[in-house]
Amino acid sequence: MSLIDWFAARRKDQFVGKVSQDTDEGDGLWVKCSECSQVAYRKDLISNFNVCSNCNHHNRINSDERINIVADKDSFKEFDSSLSPTDPLGFKDRRSYADRIKDSQTSTGLRDGVITGFCSVNSMPLALAVMDFRFMGGSMGSVVGEKITRIIERATKKNYPILIVCASGGARMQEGMLSLMQMAKISGALKKHKEKNLLYMPLLTHPTTGGVTASFAMLGDLILAEPKALIGFAGRRVIEQTLREKLPDNFQTAEYLLEHGFVDVIVKRRELKTTLTKILKIHGVNELVEANI
């Protein structure tokens, strides 16, 4: 091997071999966009809110990153952090549900797939729930449903607006009917919140599907979505096989739902806090909170 070939091999090992396909995987210096295949310096991607500067693809981010984008610095106060799922049905497919819970808790550092709490957005109060797709696909089980219900009830008592960041594959099948009941429970809590004329906003991120879409994700006074997010109930193939029709290429995207009136506004990630600030000011959030003191 010539000296030039040796240097070329070394260079390939140092750079090409460390390109990651996902911002959540590995610790390489470079990340390859799953949408346009553009290779970006990881630190540049993170500083751009994990959005590809070439094609504007919004990569998945975790719950902590979401909170940092929305909440004022050091303003987030978490509730119900000790709640953890159990296995009431003794469910087992290829692996037991209990083992899946442990694996997800170990890999994510979370107890379940949502973080809830109060925060401020440019000094205006907000009740915040952030689903995390890393934990069993963001599926909604009894703990996720209970935590979201509790934060809604707390917000109702204090006249706080609510933002729920949705990222979910739907109801958690390992909990059967217990997971399905969370749809009704959360919807009931939102109805009481609405009866006080308080603001509720879901933010639909990629993906938002199944029982989450069929319940609280579509009950907002103002429904926000991230660009190109997959939003739907059943999967595309299931619908095509049932209807025996070819669906449009952009079917179940945020843009398609905006065009057909199911989404009110598409918000780029870097503009989210500014958009929320405008909405909260228009709704006179501080005045509502003061009236409840």
Swiss-Prot record:
One Pfam family linked to the record = Carboxyl_trans
Q: Where in or outside the cell?
A: Cytoplasm
EC number(s) given by UniProt = 2.1.3.15
Instruction: Give the InterPro entries listed for this entry.
Output: AcCoA_carboxyl_beta (IPR034733), Acetyl_CoA_COase_Trfase_b_su (IPR000438), ClpP/crotonase-like_dom_sf (IPR029045), COA_CT_N (IPR011762), Znf-ACC (IPR041010)
> Which parts of the sequence are C4-type zinc fingers?
33-55
Q: Which GO terms describe its biological process?
A: fatty acid biosynthetic process; malonyl-CoA biosynthetic process
Q: What residues does Zn(2+) bind to?
A: 33, 36, 52, 55
Catalytic activity from the UniProt record: N(6)-carboxybiotinyl-L-lysyl-[protein] + acetyl-CoA = N(6)-biotinyl-L-lysyl-[protein] + malonyl-CoA
Q: Which GO terms describe its cellular component?
A: acetyl-CoA carboxylase complex
Pathway per its UniProt entry is:
Lipid metabolism; malonyl-CoA biosynthesis; malonyl-CoA from acetyl-CoA: step 1/1
Write down how the cofactor binds this protein: Binds 1 zinc ion per subunit.
MF GO annotations: acetyl-CoA carboxylase activity; ATP binding; carboxyl- or carbamoyltransferase activity; zinc ion binding
Q: What region holds the CoA carboxyltransferase N-terminal domain? A: 29-293
Cofactor(s) essential for the protein: Zn(2+)
* Gene3D superfamilies hit by this protein: 2-enoyl-CoA Hydratase, Chain A, domain 1
UniProt keyword annotations, A-Z: ATP-binding, Cytoplasm, Fatty acid biosynthesis, Fatty acid metabolism, Lipid biosynthesis, Lipid metabolism, Metal-binding, Nucleotide-binding, Transferase, Zinc, Zinc-finger
Annotated disulfide bonds: none
Top-rank lineage group of the source organism:
Bacteria
User: Its family?
Assistant: Belongs to the AccD/PCCB family.
Q: How does it assemble?
A: Acetyl-CoA carboxylase is a heterohexamer composed of biotin carboxyl carrier protein (AccB), biotin carboxylase (AccC) and two subunits each of ACCase subunit alpha (AccA) and ACCase subunit beta (AccD).
Q: What does this protein do?
A: Component of the acetyl coenzyme A carboxylase (ACC) complex. Biotin carboxylase (BC) catalyzes the carboxylation of biotin on its carrier protein (BCCP) and then the CO(2) group is transferred by the transcarboxylase to acetyl-CoA to form malonyl-CoA.
Q: What is this protein called?
A: Acetyl-coenzyme A carboxylase carboxyl transferase subunit beta
Q: Which organism is it from?
A: Prochlorococcus marinus (strain MIT 9215)
Per the UniProt record, the lineage of the source organism begins with: Bacteria, Bacillati, Cyanobacteriota, Cyanophyceae, Synechococcales
Q: Which gene encodes it?
A: accD
